[in-house]
């Protein structure tokens, strides 16, 4: 009609996904001109005219669905049926303030502005993409109905397992079970837990299986709004049945990912997997699965196989047990696109990636003093790097410590384990 435009778009950037949309105007329009489609586009473009008097305001509402046009229309009818902009604005303000009020901080206005802006960023994902009837389009492009009525996506788990999801358990615990339920629904569809889910689809971006620490963290904190045995089956299956970026037969055969067999991200993939293994072991022990506990505890120690004692660096190793030579510790790589042994980093940044066994890592260095001295070198080396390919994610360099990228986020705290907590402070 002359108040509404509906459509369907298939987007193939990053993941192939479908958007059904409804655009509704509070005033009628007239199609003034129909423009031909631009290069590669299927739909024509429209120029619309609205008969607005001076001072009039045009209001526009948009609803989306991954399922169908009817889903988008139902969302608009249920969630925003009227045209009271101020009412919607005040309700949005109320809901955001409800979240912001969960944390009280002191400091300057500038510090508070930065803090609450970060808190806002925290809460804009994951996104509940289910329609009002609970339907959603899953990772296999089929339509499902969520058991809970919600389906969370935008799960960038390599980025968020370290601090974001643990913070959700504190600041928005009412959503945690729903997030895990969504991960389990993804598992039922794909046979493994989400790695990087966007609009319900699996992007296979980044490495590791970091839905595992998210689920185990919630379980150990007492969250039980999901089937615990199914959750354990999902984390165990994701750690034993090979899938993209997870070649468990190779990993178990060598005790690491050899760079001549796994030519991209071999060091980072090994280290990230050992942390996931530790998490599986923790849940196995809690559930009394002693055989699994022993198996995954052993795998969690695989990081030791890549610590080169001559350099005290995590270094690539081939299937014959030979270290990568030559070895440039400053060579940055975004290995998924350019090759190399590290993911968005270099040896200096990934050597510390043993969050689950810092004491064991210290022993490999030869004690706390040598460990702390190496940390000092990290922070005081020249802040430069030799790049291969796209490395813009590695930002905020302080020496070789990359404050702006996830693999470094825990590193400043490691002084606490070396008896020099004042350096962390």
PLM region spans:
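Carboxylate/His-rich catalytic cores and anion/metal-binding grooves
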Residues: 106-132, 167-183, 204-238, 304
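Primarily short, surface-exposed interaction patches in extracytoplasmic proteins
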Residues: 118, 182-189, 193-198, 284
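A contiguous strand-loop segment
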Residues: 20-26, 32, 36-37, 47-51, ...
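Beta-sandwich/jelly-roll carbohydrate-recognition scaffolds of carbohydrate-active enzymes
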Residues: 1-152, 185
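Glycine-rich phosphate-binding loop of nucleotide-binding enzymes
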Residues: 1, 133-139, 162-169, 175-184, ...
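Aromatic/His-enriched, Gly/Pro-containing loop or helix-boundary segments
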Residues: 145-152, 193-211
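Active-site core of glycosidic bond-cleaving carbohydrate-active enzymes
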Residues: 147-165, 170-171, 212, 222-425
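Short, conserved secondary-structure transition motifs
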Residues: 6-13, 201-211, 239-242
């Amino acid at each position: 009609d002359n108040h509404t435009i509906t459509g369907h778009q298939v987007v193939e950037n990053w993941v192939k996904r479908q958007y059904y949309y409804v655009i509704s105007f509070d005033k009628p329009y007239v199609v003034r001109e129909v423009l031909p489609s631009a290069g590669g586009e299927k739909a024509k473009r429209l120029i619309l005219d609205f008969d607005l008097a001076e001072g009039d305001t045009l209001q526009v509402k948009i609803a989306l669905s991954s399922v169908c046009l009817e889903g988008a229309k139902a969302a608009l009818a249920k969630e925003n049926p009227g045209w009271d902009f101020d009412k919607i604005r005040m309700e949005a303000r109320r809901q955001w303030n409800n979240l912001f009020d969960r944390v009280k901080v002191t400091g300057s206005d500038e510090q508070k502005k930065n803090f609450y802006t970060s808190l806002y960023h925290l809460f804009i994902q994951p996104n509940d993409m289910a329609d009002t009837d609970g339907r959603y389009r899953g990772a296999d492009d089929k339509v499902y109905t969520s058991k809970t009525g919600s389906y969370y996506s935008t799960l960038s788990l390599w980025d968020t397992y370290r601090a974001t999801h643990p913070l959700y358990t504190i600041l928005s615990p009412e959503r945690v079970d729903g997030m895990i339920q969504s991960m389990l629904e993804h598992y039922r569809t794909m046979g493994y837990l989400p790695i990087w889910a966007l609009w319900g689809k699996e992007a296979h971006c980044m490495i590791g299986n970091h839905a595992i620490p998210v689920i185990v963290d919630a379980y150990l904190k007492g969250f039980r709004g999901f089937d615990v045995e199914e959750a354990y089956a999902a984390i165990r299956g994701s750690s034993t049945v090979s899938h993209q970026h997870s070649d468990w037969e190779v990993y178990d055969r060598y005790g690491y990912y050899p760079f001549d067999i796994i030519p991209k991200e071999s060091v980072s993939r090994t280290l990230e997997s050992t942390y996931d293994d530790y998490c599986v072991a923790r849940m196995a022990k809690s559930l009394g699965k002693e055989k699994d506990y022993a198996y995954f505890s052993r795998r969690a120690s695989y990081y030791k196989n890549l610590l080169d004692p001559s350099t005290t660096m995590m270094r690539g190793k081939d299937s014959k047990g030979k270290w990568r030579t030559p070895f440039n510790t400053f060579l940055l790589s975004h290995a998924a696109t350019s090759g190399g042994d590290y993911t968005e980093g270099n040896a200096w940044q990934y050597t510390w990636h043993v969050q689950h066994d810092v004491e064991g890592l210290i022993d490999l260095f030869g004690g706390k003093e040598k460990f702390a001295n190496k940390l000092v070198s990290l922070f005081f080396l020249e802040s430069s790097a030799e790049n291969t390919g796209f490395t813009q994610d590695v930002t905020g360099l302080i020496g070789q410590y990359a404050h702006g990228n996830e693999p470094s986020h825990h590193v400043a705290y490691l002084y606490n384990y070396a008896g020099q907590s004042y350096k962390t402070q």
